[in-house]
């Protein structure tokens, strides 16, 4: 936490405590990205590469009142507890803000748990993250997520619908 701009992955989300971490500068061709700072944010290092781009500004937004329509994209990052974060989005006004941004044509990207939060519902039948068996999502995507006993992380391949090229990750 003592050295700035050394461009290595942060150890934990301590670095995201600041409101703005981007190295980019606002200009006419700048891509301005807002990231909702979820209480259980994870995989936030996925965004660090964007912060290093000179024509990209990444702002971590802690409260829904911090949001404005100046953003080219809003990102919901990964979450360690999507069940709790879904409730937090509703309680803090983020759900309304994000829904309005989507209705107005705003671009929204969900990464991992953030993608799950954009769906209709999240089920937790075995209580992995919560005593609640299900919570409503943002209802912006027609998906339902069911949390199961064992988490499996693996590389997948597919075809990009826009250009028919093979992708993997």
Predicted regions and their residues:
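Phosphate-binding active sites in nucleotide-utilizing proteins
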Residues: 32-113, 117-120
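Cysteine-nucleophile active-site neighborhood
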Residues: 79-169
């Amino acid at each position: 936490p003592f050295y700035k701009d050394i461009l290595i992955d942060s150890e934990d989300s301590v670095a995201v405590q600041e409101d703005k971490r981007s190295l980019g500068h606002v200009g006419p061709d700048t891509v301005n990205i807002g990231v909702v700072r979820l209480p259980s944010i994870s995989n936030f290092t996925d965004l660090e590469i964007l912060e290093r781009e000179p024509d990209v500004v990444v702002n971590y937004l802690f409260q829904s009142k911090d949001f404005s329509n100046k953003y080219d994209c809003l990102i919901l990052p990964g979450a360690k507890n999507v069940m709790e974060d879904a409730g937090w989005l509703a309680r803090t006004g983020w759900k309304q803000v994000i829904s309005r941004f989507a209705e107005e044509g705003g671009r929204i990207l969900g990464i991992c748990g953030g993608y799950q939060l954009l769906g209709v519902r999240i089920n937790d039948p075995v209580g992995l993250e919560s005593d609640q068996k299900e919570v409503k999502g943002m209802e912006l995507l027609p998906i339902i997520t069911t949390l199961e006993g064992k988490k499996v992380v693996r590389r997948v391949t597919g075809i990009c619908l826009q250009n028919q090229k093979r992708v993997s990750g």
